[in-house]
C-alpha cells in the first residue's frame, strides 16, 4: 500500500471476522451447529412470500420499508415511525457508530460480547472499551465504572452471545439510569425471542431517551441467509439513523419475506418451545459427563472444558464425526465450544459424540 493512500485510523486494527465453519474437508453432509441457526428454518408462510417476490424483481423496493415496519409494530405493540430496518442488526449497529461515535469517543461493550461492536467502533475511529464480565455474565457496575465524558455508546447483548447468559430488567434499568447524559444504551436482542416474556428492553425504550433496541430475523425466524434486522428507539435517534441509511438497503424479497415471517408467531412459538426443551436436555447430558455450561437463554450452550487443549481436541473429534461446532477463542473463551441447539436427533448425536470423546481421554 502506498504511504500516500491510507485508510481511516482504526480500520487496520480490525481483525477479519470469522463466521462459523460450514464444511469439514473429506466429510459429506456434516451437521452444522456453529452459527446458531434455526434447525427448522423459516416459516412456511415466509417461504411462500419469498417465492412470490420473484415476480417483481425488476422493480425497485420500497425506500421506507412501510409494510415491514407496520408488521413489526403490530406484532410487538410499537410505533412504526420509530422502527428502522437494516441488512441484519449488524447494519443498525454500524449506523449507530457512524452517527454517534468517532475519533476521541469511547464505545463500551463486555469482554465476551459480540465481535461486531469492536469492529464497528474501530471502523469510525472510536476507542473500543472492553469491560470485564462476572462469571461470563454482564457486570453492570463494571460498565458504569468504565463510563467517562467520552462515552457515546454502550452495547449490551441480552441474552449474550456466545455465553447465553442474561441480566434482568432491574439491572437493565439501573444501567440505563446510570449512564452519562451523552451516552446511548444499545440493547442487542438477537436472541430475545428465545426468552419467554422478555420484552428485549422495550419498556426502557418507551420510558427513556437514551435506549435503543435491535433485533434480527437471522435466529428464531430462520432467515440468516437473507440478512434482515431492525431497531427501535426514540424518534430523534431513529430519524438520525435514517439519514445515513441507504434508500434501497433492503430488497423487495427481504422485505416481503420478513413481513410474512414476523406475522407467523405460531411458528416462532413452536421453535421457541422445541429449543427450550432440547437446550435443557443437552446441557444436562453434557454436565453428566463433566462438561458444564452456564444457564443459557438462547439457542445454544457454551460448553466448558478443562482447558483450551481439551476444547480443541474435542472440536477436532467432533469434526471427524461430521459435527461442526464453534470455537470461541476469539471471544476470550479458548476452553469453550459453543454448540447450537439443533433438533432432537442433532442434540442426541452431539451428546453421544462428546461422551465418546470424554471416554477416550
Swiss-Prot record:
SUPFAM superfamilies recorded for this chain? PLP-dependent transferases (SSF53383)
Enzyme class label: transferase
Does this UniProt record's set of keywords contain Ribosomal protein? no
Q: Which cofactor does it need?
A: pyridoxal 5'-phosphate
SS bond list: none
GO MF annotations in UniProt: histidinol-phosphate transaminase activity; pyridoxal phosphate binding
Pathway noted in the entry: Amino-acid biosynthesis; L-histidine biosynthesis; L-histidine from 5-phospho-alpha-D-ribose 1-diphosphate: step 7/9
Q: Give residues where N6-(pyridoxal phosphate)lysine occurs.
A: 219
**UniProt keyword list:** Amino-acid biosynthesis, Aminotransferase, Histidine biosynthesis, Pyridoxal phosphate, Transferase
The reaction(s) this protein catalyses: L-histidinol phosphate + 2-oxoglutarate = 3-(imidazol-4-yl)-2-oxopropyl phosphate + L-glutamate
Question: At the top level of its lineage, which domain of life is listed?
Answer: Bacteria
The record ties this protein, via CDD domains, to: AAT_like (cd00609)
Query: So what EC number does this one have?
Result: 2.6.1.9
Q: What GO biological process, any one, is recorded here?
A: L-histidine biosynthetic process
- Describe the protein's quaternary organization and the partners it interacts with: Homodimer.
What does the similarity note say? Answer: Belongs to the class-II pyridoxal-phosphate-dependent aminotransferase family. Histidinol-phosphate aminotransferase subfamily.
- Its recorded name reads Histidinol-phosphate aminotransferase
